[in-house]
């Protein structure tokens, strides 16, 4: 806004070309500047926000807005009293609501350049709350910003589009406007400014800083922002030296008559424009026409835009060879303007005019997204007593809009951001929003210039170069706003108030109450305060309450103001909706009619009264709106009264009810008067002063990108610009006065000497302002432009410091020619304050240098290299050769300093000692102990890198030489045959052993204490004896001799063979030269001998240790490892070839009582894989009544692949309890093919103790028909201990055709507990037809401990009938392969009472591969109680056709514990009807690495009722395909827990065809030890009677062999006859039963 200079109030200054011809507001201010009460934007820290220079306090209200009038008014006012014309005073509460607006001027910010703005708020007369409105940011544009020559230019161009005046007018001016950092900046500095661009661009924009200091232009830095360094507490300055910013020209004061054109203009207008633009370049008329014609010829003027014409002018102008240096150009965008300043008023050169064409205004981009808004709030500045969500706008209540912000460092000068107001809110308070505002920093610097657009209700802020000068800019907003009366028109209506700051939205609802009292005849309010035009706009509603006065006169008076003639209007209301509550009626609508001419308002000569005679116009109900404007004239409150009376006076009581007055109060106001203010320009030039003389020389060029700030006499910032490409700058629209111009000192530049010439136009005016990084110059405007304020800078000279770091080998402190530099030494440079400003390292030659240093004092510090020591300093007289030490001070004074050097030397030492043989192993060197020569010693640095290797000398000494201080590692290699002695024994480090690896430290001295001791490693022997243990007791007896030639193998603990030997003739063996450790000794069993019992007795040196013995040698020999063997008892080798065809009929009656106690401990590890394919067809008819109590614990892991076709019919009742723990590791490959046909009748009673190892291959084909009745009583006690490790791969294909007819009656009660782990792959095809009727009663409890390994291959054809009673203790190892085809028909009745206790502990590891194919037809009925733990993997494919008829009544109590892990894929179709009561505790832990593809197709129809409690642990992987059709009908009633003694009489009809008839009666008690390997195919007919005793003969019974044979034969015959008779009798008895 423009301020008029001080002068006579009534002086009229004519409309001069460079003066503002407008009625300014409150001109001729008294020492202070005013600010519009509007949007206030404050920058800086939130707790210390900057305030605008002036605070305006406005208080406004209309009478009807006053709280008192909002309540019921007094009875006096409720009636119309036409006779009472007296007015009420401001303080009368009962009469009117008055609003008082008080404007407060800040005491410290008077501004000679900006007139004061009048702030206004209507105050109710009776109550005058003094509400202070937050100050606006920009006094200039808010109070009043005359449009100066911009408006004139626009107007001129619009009204005179074809003017062709001379473009070189000496009175025109132009103002530069800068946009983007990378666009060209060009300003026209002289009074003669030629402007072809008629666009009015905004003023310079700027941005705030969070730093609260006044040095807004203190520093100016490099062209681009230092994004890598953003200190939060320090301003970073930036200078744009080498940029070519695009100029944005704002033509604010120009009288160019250049026609204004657009694309749609005519060709003639465009040609006139071209001619005028070319003329502005200052060329003669010939050249003007030539360029104009060239543009016309080369360009389609009809379609060309103004920009295209400008480009064509530039192109043509550049083609001409101008001799005039004023318009000669190098390039259109890089002008070199170097000219002497001979006149204080410089005209813009033709080259600058050409630049104007090339640099059209280029506005920046919107950066709303880079303005970060936080904590936005919208609150009410309440000054009356009402609800918090209600605002009284006519009482000058306002909204406070606050927010914090942060500006992104990428924002450039010319960029913009917006504050958008919503539909029902606008900026400012009672005053109209200012068109132009300024955003200032906390220290008053201009950060951005704002322009308010009423159409879009948006303020757009354009950043100034402040954002280029500083980084990390933060601050806060504090604005005021008010309801928008054009849209928020109703009282007591809720409106959403919304404002968008950048991209951040703040929104809140408020109720708006303007206080329109519709029951009053007169209601008035101040609609707004127009500070731009210095007036108050008032609105009066007449006859709003339909009182319809018969005769009325309206008049209004004002104090401290004058009514503006021509602005008093009268409108007749045709629609009452026009009388809006907001006192902002739309006077252009059809709801009102302008009837001013009918009533002719009269304004008094002094302007303080207006009269309107309505006469009788209101009598018929017409309503009127009166609008009037008041211009303040004094410093007091503007007080306006409104009257509607009969006679137009205040002398009667004939006044009508209504508002009587409003008051606008100004505090610290000033008088105003109308007039025009001349304005001028100030500026000049910033140049590069190459010769540093402070005077502009012809060859010295301008400096671009220098920040220039203009301040008033109170040091308040007014404007800021940046020098253009030619170094020029200019400030426009300035009034007379003295100003301060601040130039920011660019980085790496120094200000030139000031005032070094008597010619002010060419010398440098800027002087350094203390420690601030600015130079300051004064500029005075006295009725003319001042274009002499310039300043020069020169590049700050830089110097270098450095020298040399060397190794001072002779330690004399002086550099010698043969001494070399040390590389990579760290050197640090510090300033006089001790701050590090540079760090470097020496190069490969030891050189270093710091460059670019200014004059001053510095400190240089050298870091001592590792392993070096600083040499002595300042030796000798040659400063260039001595050492300055590790820290020295250097002064730079207009020259380089290359004498700062430092020397270091490297001290070296020795490390070593001694390696000795520590014969007594005490870890200390004794005098008698000697050194060990030839020991390898390795030296390593601290990083583990080997740096030296040596060996001990003849005396055991070693040494490493030439070592620097530091830590080293010494490693001793253990000599062959030696062992390291113990380390660090005793207190004397010089004689102890440091071990084989130790650390040696050198610290300024030799270290000769690193030694190591070793002693010879002892060797040991192991061995003893292998003997024949004739008495088999496992203990060496004196008479038992050694066995020679036995192979003994020595292995390490991992089983690797170390050595092998054999026993000598005495059975002795020995292994020597063994170290301490763990070993395995293996004895290979001599052929034909058996391992004796191991570890018998208590004498380890006398017992046998077994075949594999683990031995630990610990510092001593071990001669206790021996083993014994004995010969096998019998060795039989039989080769029998027998072909027998026997037909025997035997009737045997045997009664056997067997009591067996077996204790079996087996360790088996088995791995079996079975694949079975079975096809079964089962037809069962069972009648059973079972009461079973079964306790089963099963753990099964099965992997089976079976395909079975079975037809089985079985009836079994078994109760078995077996506890078996087996560990078996078996690997078997059995291929058995046996064909046996034997017919034998043997009766043998033998008691044998045999240990046999049989390898037999038999092929037997037997056909037997036996009818036997046997009663046997056997008592057997078997104790076998077997440990089998077998790996079996069995591929068996058996084809068995068996036809048996068995009639058996068995009743058995068995209790078994089995734990089985099986993996079988079998392929069996079996066709069996059995009809068995068995009745057996057996109670068996068996405890068996069996260890068997059998390998048999037999081919026998035997038909045998045998009755045997045997008591055997057998340990057998058999491998059998048999193929048998048997057809037997047996009828047996047996009564057995067997009591067996079986405790089996087996650990089995078996790997078997069996392929079995079976076809079985079975009919079975089973009742079993089993506790089984099985691990099976089965893959079965079964096709089962079962027809069973079962009627079962079962009471089953089963407790099973099952742990099963199964992976099955089954497809089953089952129809089951089951009633089950199951209590099961199932813990399933399956780690099944089994690939089970179980495809099960089953069709089963079963009806079962079971009560089972099962706990099973099974792991199964099954693949089964079964088709089962089962039809069972069973009716059984059985209760079996029986121990029965069965006497059976059997009649057997046996047809046997046998070539041999053998009758043998053998009673043998044999203890045999046999090892047989037989392969026999025998067809034998033998009759033998033998009695064998391998070692000890049986007691003589008194009978010879013949008697024995005969007795046996006769006994047999009689026994057979008796058995036959007995069998027939029993059979008969059974039948009768």
Swiss-Prot record:
It is a peptidoglycan-anchor. The keyword Ion transport does not apply. PANTHER family: CARBOXYPEPTIDASE REGULATORY REGION-CONTAINING, COLOSSIN-A. The modification Pentaglycyl murein peptidoglycan amidated threonine is found at residue 1597. Belongs to the serine-aspartate repeat-containing protein (SDr) family. Gene3D superfamilies: 2.60.40.1280, Immunoglobulins (2.60.40.10). Residues 46-678 are annotated as: Ligand binding A region. Residues 85-99, 146-168, 186-226, 255-266 have a biased composition (Polar residues). It comes from Staphylococcus epidermidis (strain ATCC 12228 / FDA PCI 1200). The keyword Repeat applies. GO terms for biological process: cell adhesion. Its main location: secreted. Residues 679-1129 are annotated as: Type I collagen binding region. This is Serine-aspartate repeat-containing protein F. Residues 1125-1584 have a biased composition (Acidic residues). Binds to type I collagen via alpha-2(I) or alpha-1(I) chains. SUPFAM superfamilies: Bacterial adhesins, Hypothetical protein PA1324. It comes from the Bacteria. Residues 679-797, 798-907, 908-1018, 1019-1129 form the CNA-B domain. It is found in: Secreted, Cell wall. Residues 61-74, 175-184, 227-253, 1107-1119, 1585-1606 have a biased composition (Basic and acidic residues). Residues 1-45 form the signal peptide. PROSITE patterns: GRAM_POS_ANCHORING. Residues 1598-1633 form a propeptide. Residues 51-269, 862-889, 1085-1608 are annotated as: Disordered. Each CNA-B domain is able to independently mediate adherence to the substrate.
């Amino acid at each position: 806004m423009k301020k008029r200079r001080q002068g006579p109030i009534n002086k009229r200054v004519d409309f001069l070309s460079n003066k503002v011809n407008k009625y300014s507001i409150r001109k001729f201010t008294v020492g202070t500047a005013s600010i519009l009460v509007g949007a206030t934007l404050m920058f800086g820290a939130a707790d210390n926000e900057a305030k605008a220079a002036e605070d305006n306090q406005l208080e406004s209200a209309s009478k009807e807005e006053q709280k008192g009038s909002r309540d019921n008014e007094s009875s006096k006012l409720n009636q119309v009293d036409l006779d009472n014309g007296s007015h009420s005073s401001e303080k009368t509460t009962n009469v009117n609501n008055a609003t008082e607006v008080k404007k407060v001027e800040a005491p410290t910010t008077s501004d000679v350049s900006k007139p004061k703005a009048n702030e206004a708020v209507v105050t109710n007369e009776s109550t005058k709350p003094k509400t202070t409105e937050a100050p606006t940011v920009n006094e200039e544009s808010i109070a009043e910003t005359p449009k100066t020559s911009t408006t004139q230019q626009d107007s001129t161009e619009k009204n005179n589009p074809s003017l062709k005046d001379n473009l070189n007018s000496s009175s025109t001016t132009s103002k530069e406007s800068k946009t983007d950092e990378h666009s060209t900046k060009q300003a026209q500095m002289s009074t003669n400014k030629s402007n072809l661009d008629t666009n009015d661009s905004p003023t310079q924009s700027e941005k705030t800083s969070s730093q609260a200091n006044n040095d807004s232009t203190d520093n100016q830095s490099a062209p681009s922002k230092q994004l890598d360094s953003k200190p939060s507490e320090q301003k970073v300055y930036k200078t744009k030296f080498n940029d070519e910013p695009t100029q944005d020209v704002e033509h604010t004061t120009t009288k160019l008559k250049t026609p204004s054109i657009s694309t749609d203009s005519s060709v003639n207008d465009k040609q006139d424009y071209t001619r005028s633009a070319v003329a502005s370049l200052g060329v003669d008329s010939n050249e003007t026409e030539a360029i104009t014609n060239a543009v016309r010829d080369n360009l389609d003027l009809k379609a060309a835009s103004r920009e295209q014409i400008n480009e064509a002018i530039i192109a043509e102008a550049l083609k001409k060879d101008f001799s005039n240096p004023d318009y000669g150009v190098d390039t259109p965008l890089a002008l070199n303007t170097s000219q002497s300043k001979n006149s204080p008023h410089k005209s813009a050169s033709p080259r600058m005019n050409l630049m104007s064409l090339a640099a059209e205004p280029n506005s920046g981009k919107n950066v709303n997204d880079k303005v970060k808004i936080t904590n936005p709030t919208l609150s009410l500045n309440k000054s009356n007593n009402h609800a918090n969500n209600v605002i009284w706008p006519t009482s000058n209540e306002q909204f406070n809009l606050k927010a914090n912000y942060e500006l992104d460092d990428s924002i450039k000068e010319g960029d913009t951001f917006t504050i958008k107001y919503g539909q029902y809110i606008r900026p400012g308070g009672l005053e109209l929003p200012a068109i132009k505002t300024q955003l200032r920093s906390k220290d008053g610097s201009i950060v951005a210039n704002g322009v308010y657009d009423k159409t879009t209700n948006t303020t757009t802020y354009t950043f100034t170069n402040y954002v280029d000068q500083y980084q990390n800019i933060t601050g806060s907003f504090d604005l005021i706003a008010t309801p928008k009366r054009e849209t928020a028109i109703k009282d007591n209506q809720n409106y959403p108030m919304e404002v968008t700051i950048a991209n951040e939205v703040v929104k809140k609802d408020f109720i708006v109450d303007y206080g329109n009292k519709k029951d009053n005849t007169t209601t008035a309010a101040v609609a707004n305060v127009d500070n731009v035009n210095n007036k108050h706009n008032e609105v009066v509603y007449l006859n709003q309450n339909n009182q319809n006065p018969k005769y009325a006169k309206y008049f209004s008076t004002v104090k401290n103001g004058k009514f503006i003639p021509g602005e008093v209007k009268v409108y007749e209301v045709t629609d009452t909706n026009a009388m809006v509550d907001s006192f902002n009626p739309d006077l252009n609508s059809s709801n009102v009619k302008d009837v001013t001419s009918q009533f002719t308002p009269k304004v008094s000569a002094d302007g303080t009264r207006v009269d309107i005679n309505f006469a009788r116009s209101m009598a018929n109900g017409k309503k009127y709106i009166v609008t009037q404007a008041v211009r303040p004239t004094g410093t007091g409150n503007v007080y306006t009264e409104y009257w509607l009376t009969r006679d137009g006076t205040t002398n009667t009581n004939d006044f009508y009810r209504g508002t009587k007055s409003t008051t606008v109060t100004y505090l610290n106001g000033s008088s105003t008067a109308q007039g025009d203010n001349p304005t001028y320009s100030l500026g000049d030039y910033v140049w590069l002063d190459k010769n540093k003389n402070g005077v502009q020389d012809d060859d010295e060029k301008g400096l671009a990108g220098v920040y220039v700030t203009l301040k008033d006499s109170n040091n308040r910032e007014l404007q800021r610009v940046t020098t253009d490409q030619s170094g020029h700058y200019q400030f426009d629209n300035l009034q007379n006065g003295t100003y301060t111009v601040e130039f920011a000192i660019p980085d790496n530049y120094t200000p030139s000497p000031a005032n070094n010439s008597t010619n002010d136009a060419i010398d440098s005016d800027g002087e350094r302002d203390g420690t601030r990084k600015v130079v300051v110059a004064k500029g005075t405007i006295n009725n003319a432009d001042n274009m002499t304020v310039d300043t020069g800078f020169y590049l700050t000279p830089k110097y270098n410091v450095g020298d040399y770091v060397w190794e001072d080998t002779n330690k004399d402190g002086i550099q010698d020619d043969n001494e070399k530099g040390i590389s990579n030494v760290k050197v640090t440079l510090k300033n006089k304050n001790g701050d590090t400003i540079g760090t470097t390292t020496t190069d490969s030659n030891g050189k270093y240098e710091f460059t670019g240093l200014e004059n001053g004092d510095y400190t240089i510090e050298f870091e001592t290299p590792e392993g070096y020591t600083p040499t002595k300093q300042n030796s000798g007289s040659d400063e260039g050769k001595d050492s300055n030490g590790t820290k020295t001070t250097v002064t730079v004074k207009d020259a380089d300093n290359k004498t700062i050097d430092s020397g270091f030397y490297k001290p070296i030492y020795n490390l070593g000692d001694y390696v000795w043989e520590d014969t007594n192993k005490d870890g200390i060197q004794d005098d008698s102990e000697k050194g060990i020569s030839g020991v390898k010693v390795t030296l390593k640095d601290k990083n583990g890198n080997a740096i030296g290797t040596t060996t001990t000398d003849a005396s055991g000494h070693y040494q490493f030489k030439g070592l620097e201080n530091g830590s080293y590692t010494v490693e001793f290699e253990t000599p062959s045959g030696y062992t390291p002695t113990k380390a660090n024994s005793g207190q004397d480090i010089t004689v102890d052993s440091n071990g084989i690896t130790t650390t040696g430290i050198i610290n300024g001295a030799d270290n000769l204490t690193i030694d190591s001791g070793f002693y010879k490693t002892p060797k040991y022997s192991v061995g003893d004896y292998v003997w024949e243990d004739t008495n088999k007791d496992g203990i060496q007896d004196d008479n038992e001799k050694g066995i020679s030639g036995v192979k003994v193998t020595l292995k390490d603990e991992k089983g690797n063979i170390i050595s092998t030997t054999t026993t000598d003739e005495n059975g002795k063996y020995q292994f020597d030269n063994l170290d301490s450790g763990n070993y395995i000794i293996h004895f290979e069993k001599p052929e034909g001998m058996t391992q004796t019992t191991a570890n018998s007795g208590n004498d380890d040196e006398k017992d046998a240790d077994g075949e594999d013995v683990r031995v630990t040698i610990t510092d001593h020999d071990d001669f206790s490892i021996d083993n014994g063997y004995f010969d096998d008892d019998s060795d039989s080798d039989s080769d029998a070839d027998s072909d027998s065809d026997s037909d025997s009929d035997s009737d045997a009656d045997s009664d056997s009582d067997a009591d067996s106690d077996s204790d079996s401990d087996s360790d088996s590890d088995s791995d079996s894989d079975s694949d079975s394919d079975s096809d079964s067809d089962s037809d069962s008819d069972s009648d059973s009544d079972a009461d079973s109590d079964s306790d089963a614990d099963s753990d099964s892991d099965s992997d089976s692949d079976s395909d079975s076709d079975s037809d089985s019919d079985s009836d079994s009742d078994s109760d078995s309890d077996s506890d078996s723990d087996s560990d078996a590791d078996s690997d078997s490959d059995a291929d058995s093919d046996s064909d046996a046909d034997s017919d034998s009748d043997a009766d043998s009673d033998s008691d044998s103790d045999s240990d046999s190892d049989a390898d037999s291959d038999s092929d037997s084909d037997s056909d037997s028909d036996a009818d036997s009745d046997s009663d046997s009583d056997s008592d057997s006690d078997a104790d076998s201990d077997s440990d089998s490790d077998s790996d079996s791969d069995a591929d068996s294909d058996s084809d068995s055709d068996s036809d048996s007819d068995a009639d058996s009656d068995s009743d058995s009660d068995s209790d078994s507990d089995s734990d089985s782990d099986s993996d079988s792959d079998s392929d069996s095809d079996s066709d069996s037809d059995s009809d068995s009727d068995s009745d057996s009663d057996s109670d068996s409890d068996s405890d068996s401990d069996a260890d068997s390994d059998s390998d048999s291959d037999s081919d026998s054809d035997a038909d045998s009938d045998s009755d045997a009673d045997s008591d055997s203790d057998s340990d057998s190892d058999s491998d059998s392969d048999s193929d048998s085809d048997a057809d037997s028909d047996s009828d047996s009745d047996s009564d057995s009472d067997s009591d067996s206790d079986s405790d089996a502990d087996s650990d089995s590891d078996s790997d078997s591969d069996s392929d079995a194919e079976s076809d079985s037809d079975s009919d079975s009925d089973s009742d079993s109680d089993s506790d089984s733990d099985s691990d099976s993997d089965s893959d079965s494919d079964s096709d089962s056709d079962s027809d069973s008829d079962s009627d079962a009544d079962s009471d089953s109590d089963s407790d099973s514990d099952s742990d099963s892990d199964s992976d099955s894929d089954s497809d089953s179709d089952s129809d089951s009807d089951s009633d089950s009561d199951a209590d099961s505790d199932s813990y399933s832990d399956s780690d099944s690495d089994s690939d089970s593809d179980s495809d099960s197709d089953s069709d089963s129809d079963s009806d079962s009722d079971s009560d089972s409690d099962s706990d099973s642990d099974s792991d199964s992987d099954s693949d089964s395909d079964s088709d089962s059709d089962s039809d069972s009908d069973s009716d059984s009633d059985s209760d079996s827990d029986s121990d029965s003694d069965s006497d059976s009489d059997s009649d057997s009809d046996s047809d046997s065809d046998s070539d041999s008839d053998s009758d043998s009666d053998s009673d043998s008690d044999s203890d045999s030890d046999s090892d047989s390997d037989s392969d026999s195919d025998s067809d034998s007919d033998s009759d033998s009677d033998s009695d064998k005793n391998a070692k000890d003969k049986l007691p003589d019974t008194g009978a010879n062999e013949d008697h024995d044979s005969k007795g046996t034969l006769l006994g047999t015959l009689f026994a057979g006859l008796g058995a036959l008779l007995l069998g027939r009798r029993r059979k008969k008895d059974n039948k009768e039963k």
